[in-house]
Amino acid sequence: MDHAPYGGVVPEIAARAHVESIDAIAAEAMRAADLGFDQLDGVAATAGPGLVGGVMVGLAFGKAVSLARGVPLVAVNHLEGHAVSARLGADIAYPFLLLLVSGGHCQLLEVSGVGACKRLGTTIDDAAGEAFDKIAKTLGLPYPGGPALEKLAVGGDAARYTLPRALLGRKDCDFSFSGLKTAAARIAETLTTDDERRDLAAAVQGAIARQLSERVDRAMKLYKESHAPDEQRFVVAGGVAANGAVRAALLADCEKNGFSFAAPPLAYCTDNAAMIALAGAERLALGISDDLDAVARPRWPLDEAAALANPANAYGRKGAKA
């Protein structure tokens, strides 16, 4: 079912679509891989964080296959899937500095191995991808808004509008996009021409790319204090990693600070099953699996210690944020 008329994902529609589609999609995936279920060595299923209705459907399906075939289950944090997604297209060794940037998440992490993440910074309000999508909606663009805004921004004059630069000069690695989102929405209400909309799209894209670049530059300096030169690897993952302006800004950070750059193939920037399979395979290779009583988790921080240490940024009314 199409979420576009609603301007975003509707949880109830998404959960029902999972129920209706998962059997056929799993069967098609096995046909495409030319494999039978009897050839599986294990099953990896997303257990969170995310909209819990859909997560429960996928996790239940994974448990059923695990039980029926007698193979181990790995309940995967989907953020860990993003963390390893660049390894789908390249041989990237641990450790590395990761920018995980999507519609729901914006974090900087040191990734030292499978499941070993130390958070350096996170958003204190909205994620970058959410800012892209919400501002795109105010400009009358279709969902998903990020790609539509990037397309509109081509040829726009980013200097036409002055937008706020949040947390400028801060020595930490946190992000903030709520002020940008509000300012852009107010400007959007006054626009009357396509050129104005194009220029605002370019300004928004530039502002988001600039803030990501500034915080990554800070994180690289911190990372270098505790890592050898041959460990200076940078990975960007998540849906926003597909944005060309963002990639260009982050590439410039890498060149400035002496880091290698890696990102998933464009097809694997957004949520996908391949990254979950890889995360599960890496855990299985280390002998790590989960019991069939693994639960679906709407919130699941990658760095539990950081979440506990900074509850103001890490916890909401419904528990630990991702």
Predicted feature locations:
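A short helix-loop
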Residues: I92, L100-V101, L108-E196, A252, ...
